[in-house]
A protein has these predicted regions:
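Aromatic- and carboxylate-enriched substrate-binding clefts and catalytic-loop regions
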Residues: 66-171
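Conserved structural scaffold segments of CAZyme catalytic domains across common CAZy folds
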Residues: 1-97
């Protein structure tokens, strides 16, 4: 067991990584409120509880799931502005003090609308966000293949890890 995953086949069959410095890419376990209960509560005390859980377990990450930026998949959705009940600077400070980094959930159409991701990714880097989880791509045509690559390239510039949730099979 483990022979395939530990082999050099992926590196051998693919071009070299286009990202020169990959030290910031650190996989790890993540606390996540929706994972536990199927319920998402965008409340400061609940988010802090999951940050505390991640810290107690030695997990490096906590994901703030859907609704963190209010209405999603709507023209008025703004992936740079947290919902009014969330104090993002406080969340990030609290997490950092406990050795936990934050991931943020995003709806794909909100990311794509007017290339919102370009400004948002720079902001997330400034905030100290570790990564983003993009959801509901719901297609696998060439447009989407190219979109994934644009997102990855922009995220890498801002040292953001990316989880494409429900993604098409990789090429």
């Amino acid at each position: 067991p483990g022979q395939f995953i530990e082999s050099e086949i992926i590196r051998t069959l693919n071009p070299p990584c286009a990202i020169e410095d990959t030290e910031w890419i650190k996989p790890g376990l993540c606390a996540w409120d929706h994972w536990w209960s199927g319920e998402v509560k965008m409340e400061m005390d609940v988010i802090k509880e999951y940050i505390d859980l991640a810290s107690a377990q030695g997990w490096p990450y906590m994901l703030i799931d859907w609704q963190w930026y209010g209405p999603y998949n709507e023209a008025k959705a703004d992936i740079t502005k947290p919902a009014p009940q969330l104090d993002m600077p406080e969340i990030l400070r609290y997490a950092k003090e406990r050795g936990v980094r934050i991931w943020l959930w995003l709806y794909s159409s909100d990311v794509n609308r007017n290339d919102a991701y370009k400004e948002a990714f720079r902001l997330y880097q400034k905030w100290g966000v570790a990564g983003i989880k993009i959801d509901f791509m719901d297609r696998q045509d060439q447009y989407m293949v190219n979109w994934y690559r644009r997102i990855i390239e922009e995220a890498a510039k801002c040292q953001l890890m990316v989880n494409f949730h429900g993604a098409y099979k990789p090429d």
